A protein has these predicted regions:
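Ser/Thr-rich, Pro/Gly/Ala-heavy low-complexity intrinsically disordered linkers and tails
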Residues: 19-106, 143
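Intrinsic-disorder/low-complexity regions
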Residues: 4, 23-28, 47, 62, ...
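Conserved functional hotspot residues at active sites or interaction interfaces
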Residues: 151, 190-235, 240-242, 247-394, ...
Length: 626
């Protein structure tokens, strides 16, 4: 089906600073909602932008709308009572001038409304004509089918009147599986999931997706699973579907977390390539209350694990820069990969590898250098695999409708030559949410007495990127092209990286035989301080030898983990921030929380003998202007 949210795209392209500035501590933004935005070719429009939201990378001819930003708050185009904000009564529309005793005549041929009567001004204080309107009158338009910007319900679909008043167009699906309904009094979606208000990792609509894994770890003894954290005081009903077919229904109690195993999708998990599209490959998870979702591949503590923070649909865009890891040649070769999941039918996805190309397993419209165009339908998953000498890091993904992107590796050593290999995966943050400054810190070793080394990749999301480090790091500082990156080898350094352009920063935990304690490779994306939050609810599988939450907090912040104060912060240079490695109790069910009186950033990880996982514990996803 066609998709052209022109009004929404105009808002997105012109109001990024407002969207970034308006978020509160919960990432709330007055111009967003979680109700499903429906594709349409006739949404009211004041402009027809055709340029991409980013001009730094490979050119895209489509904006990347943040889904749901045409919200239930109806701040754009109409009031919440379904009456056009632009309508007015009266017979003139003029203004009182100097020396006059009444309103100035309206200009000749201007159309004004007197109630439901359209009047055409004669320029002399009278009217050329007066026409009773059978349905509605709109200033400047005259008789119309509906008042532009007004809303109504068509079943459980919220409709908005087009700008020319010619009729209503579907805009929002008030999804009952997200606890919503359409209110006939104002034509808008109601319910907890209709009023999220902001862009963050908290949402009601997610697409968990199985990723490439070693074949002999795919099976019922090592289940793929999602952990759902209910952030509200009400029970959340969870519905999982796949390709429109029901998979399961579950309930997550208020303010708690539940791990929910899901069947493996063998077409995505097994083998080592080639690049392909798996129709209906993704699960769709919907909740009647706002929740957060993490996926574990697999759930059980094992020697080839990782985990990903899932991003709700209302935060997806059409622009991403990929972080992955190079093809590993041992044991016949294991590929790095990235995946793209579509929310809507007929989604056009263009992928462009960094530096013009990288060795890639061709397939599904992607060539042997990692470039191509692929069409996806709702729930379809494109998986792109590297081959000998290839690395998908820096690939630019551009789509004409919102998509989800993950990156990682089937199983790899970090660095090469250091035992053992482990699965890598992480959700990639949209380009629009990336920042120019990141604090990079290493994780803790299992004993909590020392820190574990990482390899850090800093990827340019825009061309002509210049890096600075505090303290300095011995790497190239100039990145000429989108997707170029620098790699800081095995290090336990804590530092800040800054740029005048947007960056993506990925950290890779080194293998156990590197000599930094129990663990194996795992992958995480650094979260910029601009996207920090004051509260988090998350899950750490209690069967791991040790689980930690790392907290980056402003100096002097009061932070609680599971209700206990955190006091072991150490300053991170002269940044004004401090770091705490907090060991999590494995005595409960895996539910944990972080609260603070200032915004903080967290990452969560677990380690065992030759095994580990790592993911960002959460973040806001406010739109950060270029």
């Amino acid at each position: 089906m066609a998709y052209a949210h022109r009004r929404l795209l105009h808002l997105f392209a012109t109001a990024l600073p407002l969207a970034a500035a308006c978020g509160d501590d919960n990432g709330r933004d007055s111009a967003s909602a979680s109700a499903t935005t429906l594709p349409s070719t006739t949404v009211p429009s004041t402009s027809d932008p055709t340029t991409a939201t980013t001009t730094a990378g490979p050119t895209s001819t489509t904006d990347a709308p943040t889904e749901g930003t045409a919200s239930a708050s109806a701040t754009d185009g109409g009031s919440t009572d379904g009456v056009s904000a632009g309508s007015s009564g009266g017979t003139s529309g003029g203004t009182t001038g100097p020396g006059t005793t009444g309103p100035m005549p309206c200009p000749e041929d201007q159309v004004v409304c007197d109630g439901n009567t359209a009047q055409v001004c004669d320029g002399m204080g009278g009217f050329k004509s007066e026409t009773p309107c059978p349905k509605a009158c709109a200033p400047g338009l005259g008789c119309v089918e509906c008042e532009p910007g007004s809303a109504q319900c068509n079943g459980q679909v919220s409709q908005v009147c087009k700008e020319d008043g010619s009729g209503f167009v579907d805009t929002l699906e008030c999804d009952p599986l997200q606890g919503m309904m359409c209110d006939p009094n104002n034509g808008l979606c109601t319910g907890a999931c209709a009023n999220l208000g902001g862009l963050s990792y908290i949402g009601c609509d997610y697409y968990p997706v199985v990723t490439q894994q070693l074949d002999f770890y795919v099976g019922p003894n090592n289940p793929y699973a999602v952990a759902v954290a209910n952030t509200t005081a009400d029970n959340a009903t969870i519905t999982v579907t796949k390709g429109g077919a029901p998979v399961l229904t579950d309930m997550v109690p208020a303010n708690s977390v539940k791990a929910i195993p899901l069947p493996w999708v063998n077409e995505l998990a097994l083998g080592t390539g080639p690049s392909s599209v798996v129709p209906d490959g993704a699960y769709r998870l919907r909740s009647t209350q706002p929740v957060t979702v993490y996926q574990f591949n697999p759930l059980n503590a094992d020697v080839t694990n990782d985990a990903s923070l899932m991003l709700p649909v209302n935060t997806w865009t059409g622009n991403y820069v990929v972080a992955a890891w190079p093809f590993w040649n041992d044991f016949g070769g294991y590929p790095g990969w990235y995946s793209v999941t579509a929310r809507y039918d007929n989604t056009k996805v263009t992928v462009q590898a960094a530096k013009g190309g990288t060795p890639t397993q061709a397939g599904a419209g992607v060539d042997g250098q990692g470039n191509g165009v692929v069409m996806l339908n709702e729930g379809d998953v494109l998986q792109v695999f590297s081959t000998f000498g290839g690395d998908g890091t820096g690939t630019f993904v551009a789509a004409d409708k919102p998509v989800q992107v993950l990156g990682g590796h089937e199983c790899t050593q970090v660095p090469f030559g250091i035992t053992a290999c482990d699965h890598l995966e992480e959700s990639i943050f949209p380009f629009e949410t990336l920042a120019r400054e990141y604090i990079v810190v290493p994780p803790a070793q299992a004993n909590g007495q020392a820190e574990k080394a990482v390899i850090v990749r800093i990827v340019a999301a825009e061309a002509n990127t210049v890096l600075t480090f505090e303290p300095d790091q011995p790497v190239n500082k100039n990145l000429a092209n989108v997707g170029d990156f620098v790699e800081i080898p095995t290090t336990t350094a804590k530092f800040v990286v800054k740029s005048d352009k947007k960056l993506l920063v990925a950290e890779y935990m080194v293998g156990q035989d590197a000599g930094y304690g129990t663990s194996d490779p795992a992958m995480v994306l650094a979260v910029p301080s601009e996207q920090f939050r004051t509260n988090y609810l998350f899950y750490a599988q209690p069967n791991w030898s040790a689980n930690f939450v790392d907290i980056i907090a402003p100096a002097g912040a009061n932070v609680m983990v599971d209700g206990a104060g955190v006091g072991n912060f150490t300053p991170i240079g002269a940044t004004g921030f401090s770091l705490a490695h907090v060991a999590l109790s494995n005595g409960g069910g895996g539910n944990h929380s972080v609260t603070a009186d200032q915004k903080v950033g967290i990452s969560v990880y677990g380690v065992l003998d030759y095994g580990s996982y790592w993911y960002p514990g959460g973040l806001d996803l406010a739109l950060i202007p270029q």
